[in-house]
């Protein structure tokens, strides 16, 4: 496959968005893989890799406690897409890769991976913030109930109202 124009910028942006280790695995020759890896700035690369080698690499990374995202577009990527914590297929890729992947990126542009990571980060931030609020608010309601400041019906009403408000805000 030819090198995508946006590959280097996408790798840099993914690293800036919090991806700590970026690995390229390809069936291409060592010489070709090394040249591409240097140009795009990945942390590690593996050449002349078979489909089962990709899946085995992912299993080893997961066994080491890492969360693994696999991006692929071909039939040969299917076992690895399935093995990863999150498999991402490129829309112009093989149909089986799109079926196996957890997410299919609609545009044939690696920058979409950066957008996906930014959306993911924003959603997780919102979930954590909402969780902290609900726990703190409910602990306050329990404390007020135990202290006799709030009646049980008032506490239940406030609890349900806060849950509804957080749900609507989300």
Which residues make up each language-model segment?
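Cytosolic catalytic headpiece
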Residues: 1-76, 80-86, 118-121
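Membrane-embedded alpha-helical bundles of multi-pass transporters
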Residues: 18-19, 40, 76-77, 82-86, ...
């Amino acid at each position: 496959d030819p090198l995508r124009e946006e590959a280097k910028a996408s790798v840099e942006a993914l690293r800036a968005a919090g991806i700590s280790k970026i690995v390229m695995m390809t069936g291409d020759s060592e010489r070709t893989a090394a040249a591409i890896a240097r140009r795009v700035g990945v942390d590690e690369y593996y050449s002349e890799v078979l489909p089962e080698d990709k899946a085995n690499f992912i299993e080893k990374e997961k066994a080491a406690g890492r969360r693994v995202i696999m991006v692929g577009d071909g039939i040969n990527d299917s076992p690895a897409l399935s093995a990863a914590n999150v498999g991402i297929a490129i829309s112009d890729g093989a149909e089986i890769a799109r079926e196996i992947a957890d997410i299919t990126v609609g545009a044939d542009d690696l920058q979409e991976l950066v957008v996906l990571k930014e959306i993911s980060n924003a959603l997780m931030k919102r979930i954590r913030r909402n969780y902290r609020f609900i726990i703190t608010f409910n602990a306050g309601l329990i404390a007020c109930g135990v202290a006799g400041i709030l009646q049980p019906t008032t506490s239940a009403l406030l609890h349900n109202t806060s849950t509804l408000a957080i749900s609507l805000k989300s």
